[in-house]
UniProtKB/Swiss-Prot annotation:
Cited function: Negative regulator of class I heat shock genes (grpE-dnaK-dnaJ and groELS operons). Prevents heat-shock induction of these operons.
Protein's name in the database: Heat-inducible transcription repressor HrcA
Family: Belongs to the HrcA family.
Gene Ontology terms, MF aspect: DNA binding
Keyword annotations of the record: Repressor, Stress response, Transcription, Transcription regulation
Gene Ontology annotations of biological process type: negative regulation of DNA-templated transcription
Species the sequence originates in: Afipia carboxidovorans (strain ATCC 49405 / DSM 1227 / KCTC 32145 / OM5) (Oligotropha carboxidovorans)
DNA damage keyword on record: no
The UniProt record lists the keyword Transcription: yes
Gene3D superfamilies the UniProt entry points to: 3.30.450.40, Heat-inducible transcription repressor hrca homolog, domain 3, Winged helix-like DNA-binding domain superfamily/Winged helix DNA-binding domain
Alphabetical list of Pfam families matching this protein: HrcA (PF01628)
Coiled-coil regions listed in the entry: none
Gene: hrcA
Amino acid sequence: MSHHDPKEALITPGAALSQLNERSRDIFRQIVENYLATGEPVGSRNISRMISVPLSPASVRNVMADLEQLGLIYAPHTSAGRLPTELGLRFFVDALMQVGDLTEDERQSIQAQLAAIGKQQSIEATLSDAMMRLSGLTRAAAVVLTGKSNPRLKHIEFVRLEPEQALVVLVSEDGQIENRVLALPPGVPSSALIEASNFLNSRIRGRTLSEVRGELEAALAQRRSELDQLTQKIIAAGVASWSGGSSDERRLIVRGHANLLEDLHAMEDLERVRLLFDDLETKKGVADLLGLAEQGEGVRIFIGSENKLFSLSGSSTITAPYRDSSGRIVGVLGVIGPTRLNYARVIPMVDYAARIVSQMLGK
């Protein structure tokens, strides 16, 4: 997409709308809808046949000149036709587009696909499967930034794997199970592992790790005489194994890359998608963008270079936050595709998918 015209930065969708009469809006809508449907520029002759009020190609050209002056459309060098600029797309999405509700069939399809996801799997696997299905429904790449995991804890256990290695198993109240492998000091008896488990279980139940971490450290300091040194070391190591781990760790899951390869029109499209693949592969900026999206309520739309965080000129991102059982925003999901996404269809799909995922995580 072009964003070369300095005027583009100076005009808001509201200001553009006030400068367009019904005829100009109709012509502009045809240019955008043709682009969303085909990816191709459209010329005045074709537009004069498409619009509701008949106009000569010459009159259409005059209106197109005005739209170009406003920075809403541009002429790609290869063609006499016109395409919307990024500003034009933003104007269309904000001011002209009718976002339809999903049909009952579409709702049921999303619900059925997401309901088919295994109940027994981890939250991460659930989200990964949900994104695979969302990418299939939207024909774009689907992304999810998993929530900061800080669940209320139910049980902790140390299981010996080898003489100097144990598995720390942490079970949360919402059924998540986290495992960490822990190096043990030489000569640790099994009784020390049991004592460490008992010490922690008497303090963590029903609370988050961040709530109890300071208290555990204080309790360890006070009870040094009662607990032998090996047990103290195991407890400290067990707590530390989580402090840099799941409580702050966020995963970015990307599914459906192949959808971005469909419908490529030219070498420049291929180059744009190659750059996008690189970004998705290295996760560069994607997590930052989704983190930004998480700060707002509802669906957010980033078109082309509005997204300053990674080289996505020519691509759009549509996101919505999802919530845990207490209604707290814990992550964000969405789709990334070409700027010619079917916005009217994809926006309600992303919104609905976020609601269904929230329901699934809330159970």
